[in-house]
Amino acid sequence: MNIGILGTGSIARTMAAEFAKVPAFRCEAVCSRQQATGEALAQQFGIPKVYTDYDAMLADPDIELVYIATPNSLHYAQTKAALLAGKNVLCEKPFVPTVAEADELIALAKEKHLFLFEAITTAHHPNYALAKQYLDDIGSLRIVSCTFCQYSSRYDALLSGQVPPVFDPACCGGALMDLNLYNVHFVVGLFGEPMLVSYHPNLYRNGIDTSGILLLEYPDFICQCTGAKDCAAPGSVQLIGDAGRILIEPGSSNCQKLRLVRPGQEDICSKYSESPWFYEVAEIAMILALKDYDACYAALKKTQQVVTVLEAAREDAQLGF
């Protein structure tokens, strides 16, 4: 399947490298506002076509799937345009800010019989499936704790007076939408939507959340999801029951190492060495090859639930976007 890449940032480069590992994918074109950045990406990965106009790339009959790697606030309009042009879409996380936008795009994809995916690593990792399998082994679940704290390479720019898109409310930036989203995907993917959502952010003077703690309440257990772009700490997920616990490191975006711990029993460990994007791209390629719309729609259902939680969290904290 021929891919057109929209955007030239670091995640676009990462995904271009992953696409190259999968024979089913071929990067056919890249679209950038600036010719020079588009040409640089194209040269690095052997991409034959460079566009500076998105509509022109969408009009290219060779493009079958558009990968959208642009600021969060652009995802809705760019995804809709691609679907209307008859293209399958892989949209970088976070999918879109609102439930209404998510519902509209998913309905449009189904109407046009197109594939639509949110690019999110969490659900595709083998250890994520293993964590679900081991839930019964830890007894009654009581606490889930997820931590993703990564000092942003753009945070110093924010402190100096600049407003990078990742810290701009107008671009739907912030720690919740960029990092804590992975924690939400991990939890909601396993347990569905919570009963109650509350978000407790640290706010910068422009109103953006640079870090925060999200609480998700379920009938029999509670989840604490910590996400930060203004400080750093080791990442992890812990699912703690009354008969044991599951530890995942380095966290919800990369379930590389899993350990099942139970008193009086030998630990069960699982470790994978591939990048988390490898599993994401490989599974999407398989879904496309099999024309497995049911798998696509099941993933979109989880995306809808995550968007619902994130929108509720922003409303609870009165973030204003």
Cite the ranges covered by each PLM segment.
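Contiguous beta-strand/loop segments that form the cofactor/metal-binding neighborhood of enzyme cores
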Residues: 183-253, 282-291
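Beta-loop-alpha module in the N-terminal Rossmann-like domain of NAD(P)-dependent dehydrogenases
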Residues: 3, 45-106
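C-terminal helix-rich "cap/oligomerization" subdomain common to oxidoreductases
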Residues: 65-67, 103, 283-321
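Hydrophobic residues in well-ordered beta-strands that form the structural core
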Residues: 51, 91, 116-118, 248
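Rossmann-fold dehydrogenase core element
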Residues: 104-122, 140-143
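Active-site loop of classical SDR/Rossmann-like NAD(P)-dependent oxidoreductases
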Residues: 271-282, 298
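Predominantly a Rossmann-like dinucleotide-binding segment in NAD(P)-dependent oxidoreductases
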Residues: 123-195, 320
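N-terminal Rossmann-like dinucleotide-binding module
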Residues: 1-45, 319
